[in-house]
Swiss-Prot record:
UniProt entry tagged with the keyword Ubl conjugation: no
GO molecular function: large ribosomal subunit rRNA binding; structural constituent of ribosome
Cystine crosslinks: none
Biological role stated in the UniProt entry: Binds to 23S rRNA. Forms part of two intersubunit bridges in the 70S ribosome.
Keyword rRNA-binding tagged: yes
UniProt-recorded name of the protein: Large ribosomal subunit protein uL14
């Protein structure tokens, strides 16, 4: 469960390392987000000499959460960290690689490019 002020690790090579959520997309009253949800965030840490700088406002899709999510078959899945992948206006990833596992729910929510770039899909 991702809410305002949550810090997320960035799971791609776009140049950002850590982002801080400032808005969960999906309406003004929406409080929390989960895997596959789009968030607006501020870059808190970045790699030097890249396009994305500290303080930039970016859009990202959540790919891993510590809070477990229930699947339709009754199983649960959770990860060791909260992570996101930075995306552009067309919902395409800015980076060319995705690090760590991602949930297969991303493909169902229309982020098949991120799922195909990932090392593992759980």
């Amino acid at each position: 469960m991702i809410q305002l002020e949550s810090y997320l690790r960035v799971a791609d090579n776009s140049g950002a390392k850590v982002i801080k959520v400032i808005q969960v997309s999906g309406g003004s009253k929406r409080k929390t987000g989960s895997i596959g949800d789009i968030v607006v965030a501020s870059v808190r840490e970045a790699v030097p000499n890249t396009d994305i700088k500290k303080g930039d406002i970016v859009r990202a899709v959540v790919v891993r959460t510590k809070k477990e999510i229930r699947r339709p078959d009754g199983t649960y899945i959770r990860f060791d960290d909260n992570a996101a992948v930075i995306i552009d206006k067309q919902n395409q990833p800015k980076g060319t690689r995705v690090f760590g596992p991602v949930a297969r729910e991303l493909r169902e929510k229309g982020f098949s490019k991120i799922a195909s770039l990932a090392q593992e899909v759980w």
